[in-house]
């Protein structure tokens, strides 16, 4: 084995020279230079400074403007809530530990940080699954004239939390475990060891199949069918140009969210899968640190995409920030065709 395994950690560094110490008790400066830990801390500070206000603003603006409280927006707000969990439960912890060069909060703090990071990522993934299914059902209409209403949105939100907890909670109760990863300043699922005492191998397989592969299959199937249906409807001119434009803009926004999710999380999932399937292989701490910290940027991109691509929300946000006045006028609101409301596109 090219790393050093302890009772509740795995350091990707051989202890042949005797320098490896517990990441819960000693600085890990033998893994990387102190300035590299400082860079991680600066990065986490940036995510906190950007992630909190933009996600909080998303929630606040929706509460202030009743017209934004549409069923589809419930799912988008669910993403903002999950991102705030990551900011407060994970980012603040990682900022502090990076400044100290090791995970100063011990195994309990590691469990909490790993739980919030996993929970936030899984809520985002399953929210995208619900959005994909909503787009598929509404646009492709496999169930006749189905309308995505408030009750469906609430059930969708509940579903995302149940599935996310089904992934994030087991390591807290003995099925797998959370351990420091990479440079030992943030925590995640143990992909590094088989650890039969906690049935780690079965959990990692379960996680990759149920909480990554299946969601990806559902998302790609739904959008594959959706693209085909929209093209057919446009070719047959079954709906007005305004309706088609609105559907395309909403669908485009959700697809971009999926692409952004893949960009942030696929590198982390790929590296984790490689480490798990190549037990004992030689890799350095940076190998896992970079994709792990890059994935944390997911807390920022969803609200940014939503604000940039939804004129109605953007106008409401400007009105809120300007104390009820819109310096751009009301034309943008009336002209907006990108409202996230129930689709009326007919089946092909």
Curated annotation (Swiss-Prot):
<feature type="modified residue" description="Phosphoserine">
    <location>
        <position position="343"/>
    </location>
</feature>
<comment type="similarity">
    <text>Belongs to the G-protein coupled receptor 1 family. Opsin subfamily.</text>
</comment>
<feature type="transmembrane region" description="Helical; Name=6">
    <location>
        <begin position="253"/>
        <end position="274"/>
    </location>
</feature>
<feature type="transmembrane region" description="Helical; Name=1">
    <location>
        <begin position="37"/>
        <end position="61"/>
    </location>
</feature>
<feature type="short sequence motif" description="'Ionic lock' involved in activated form stabilization">
    <location>
        <begin position="134"/>
        <end position="136"/>
    </location>
</feature>
<keyword id="KW-1015">Disulfide bond</keyword>
<feature type="site" description="Plays an important role in the conformation switch to the active conformation">
    <location>
        <position position="113"/>
    </location>
</feature>
<feature type="modified residue" description="N6-(retinylidene)lysine">
    <location>
        <position position="296"/>
    </location>
</feature>
<dbReference type="InterPro" id="IPR027430">
    <property type="entry name" value="Retinal_BS"/>
</dbReference>
<dbReference type="GO" id="GO:0008020">
    <property type="term" value="F:G protein-coupled photoreceptor activity"/>
</dbReference>
<feature type="disulfide bond">
    <location>
        <begin position="110"/>
        <end position="187"/>
    </location>
</feature>
<protein>
    <recommendedName>
        <fullName>Rhodopsin</fullName>
    </recommendedName>
</protein>
<dbReference type="GO" id="GO:0060342">
    <property type="term" value="C:photoreceptor inner segment membrane"/>
</dbReference>
<feature type="topological domain" description="Cytoplasmic">
    <location>
        <begin position="134"/>
        <end position="152"/>
    </location>
</feature>
<feature type="topological domain" description="Cytoplasmic">
    <location>
        <begin position="62"/>
        <end position="73"/>
    </location>
</feature>
<feature type="transmembrane region" description="Helical; Name=5">
    <location>
        <begin position="203"/>
        <end position="224"/>
    </location>
</feature>
<dbReference type="GO" id="GO:0042622">
    <property type="term" value="C:photoreceptor outer segment membrane"/>
</dbReference>
<feature type="topological domain" description="Extracellular">
    <location>
        <begin position="174"/>
        <end position="202"/>
    </location>
</feature>
<keyword id="KW-0449">Lipoprotein</keyword>
<dbReference type="Pfam" id="PF00001">
    <property type="entry name" value="7tm_1"/>
</dbReference>
<keyword id="KW-0812">Transmembrane</keyword>
<feature type="glycosylation site" description="N-linked (GlcNAc...) asparagine">
    <location>
        <position position="2"/>
    </location>
</feature>
<feature type="binding site">
    <location>
        <position position="201"/>
    </location>
    <ligand>
        <name>Zn(2+)</name>
    </ligand>
</feature>
<feature type="glycosylation site" description="N-linked (GlcNAc...) asparagine">
    <location>
        <position position="15"/>
    </location>
</feature>
<keyword id="KW-0716">Sensory transduction</keyword>
<feature type="transmembrane region" description="Helical; Name=7">
    <location>
        <begin position="287"/>
        <end position="308"/>
    </location>
</feature>
<dbReference type="GO" id="GO:0046872">
    <property type="term" value="F:metal ion binding"/>
</dbReference>
<feature type="region of interest" description="Interaction with SAG">
    <location>
        <begin position="330"/>
        <end position="348"/>
    </location>
</feature>
<keyword id="KW-0966">Cell projection</keyword>
<feature type="lipid moiety-binding region" description="S-palmitoyl cysteine">
    <location>
        <position position="323"/>
    </location>
</feature>
<dbReference type="GO" id="GO:0016038">
    <property type="term" value="P:absorption of visible light"/>
</dbReference>
<dbReference type="InterPro" id="IPR017452">
    <property type="entry name" value="GPCR_Rhodpsn_7TM"/>
</dbReference>
<dbReference type="GO" id="GO:0005502">
    <property type="term" value="F:11-cis retinal binding"/>
</dbReference>
<keyword id="KW-0862">Zinc</keyword>
<feature type="topological domain" description="Cytoplasmic">
    <location>
        <begin position="225"/>
        <end position="252"/>
    </location>
</feature>
<dbReference type="GO" id="GO:0016020">
    <property type="term" value="C:membrane"/>
</dbReference>
<feature type="topological domain" description="Cytoplasmic">
    <location>
        <begin position="309"/>
        <end position="348"/>
    </location>
</feature>
<comment type="subunit">
    <text>Homodimer. May form a complex composed of RHO, GRK1 and RCVRN in a Ca(2+)-dependent manner; RCVRN prevents the interaction between GRK1 and RHO. Interacts with GRK1. Interacts (phosphorylated form) with SAG. Interacts with GNAT1. Interacts with GNAT3. SAG and G-proteins compete for a common binding site. Interacts with PRCD; the interaction promotes PRCD stability. Forms a complex with ASAP1 and ARF4. Forms a complex with ASAP1, RAB11A, Rabin8/RAB3IP, ARF4 and RAB11FIP3; the complex regulates Golgi-to-cilia rhodopsin/RHO transport in photoreceptors.</text>
</comment>
<feature type="modified residue" description="Phosphothreonine">
    <location>
        <position position="342"/>
    </location>
</feature>
<feature type="modified residue" description="N-acetylmethionine">
    <location>
        <position position="1"/>
    </location>
</feature>
<dbReference type="Pfam" id="PF10413">
    <property type="entry name" value="Rhodopsin_N"/>
</dbReference>
<dbReference type="GO" id="GO:0005886">
    <property type="term" value="C:plasma membrane"/>
</dbReference>
């Amino acid at each position: 084995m090219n790393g050093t395994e302890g009772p509740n950690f795995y350091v990707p560094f051989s202890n042949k020279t005797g320098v490896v110490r517990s990441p819960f008790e000693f600085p890990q400066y033998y893994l990387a230079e102190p300035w590299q830990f400082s860079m991680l801390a600066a990065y986490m500070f940036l995510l906190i400074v950007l992630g909190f206000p933009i996600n909080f603003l998303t929630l606040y603006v929706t509460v202030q403007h009743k017209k934004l409280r549409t069923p589809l927006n419930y799912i988008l707000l669910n993403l903002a809530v999950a991102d705030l969990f990551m900011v407060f439960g994970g980012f603040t912890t990682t900022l502090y530990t990076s400044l100290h060069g090791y995970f100063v909060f011990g195994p309990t703090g590691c469990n909490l940080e790993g739980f919030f990071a996993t929970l936030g990522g899984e809520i985002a993934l399953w929210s995208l699954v619900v959005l994909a299914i909503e787009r598929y059902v509404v646009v492709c209409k496999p169930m006749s004239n189905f309308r995505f209403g408030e009750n469906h949105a609430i059930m969708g939100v509940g579903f995302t939390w149940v599935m996310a907890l089904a992934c994030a909670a087991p390591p807290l109760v003995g099925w797998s475990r959370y351990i420091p990863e990479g440079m030992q300043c943030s925590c995640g699922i143990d992909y590094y060891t088989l650890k039969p005492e906690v049935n780690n191998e079965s959990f990692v397989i379960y996680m990759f199949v149920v909480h990554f592969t299946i969601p990806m299959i559902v998302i790609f199937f739904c959008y594959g069918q959706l693209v085909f249906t929209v093209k057919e409807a446009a070719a047959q001119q079954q709906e007005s140009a305004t309706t088609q434009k609105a559907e395309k803009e909403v669908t485009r926004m959700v697809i971009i969210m999926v692409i952004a999710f893949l960009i942030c999380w696929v590198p982390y999932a790929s590296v984790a899968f490689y480490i798990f399937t190549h037990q004992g292989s030689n890799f350095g701490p940076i190998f896992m640190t970079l994709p792990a910290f890059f994935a944390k940027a997911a807390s920022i991109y969803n609200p940014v995409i939503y604000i940039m691509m939804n004129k109605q929300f953007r106008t409401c946000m400007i009105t809120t920030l300007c104390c009820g006045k819109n310096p751009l006028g009301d034309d943008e609101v009336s002209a907006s065709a990108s409202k996230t409301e129930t689709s009326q596109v007919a089946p092909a």
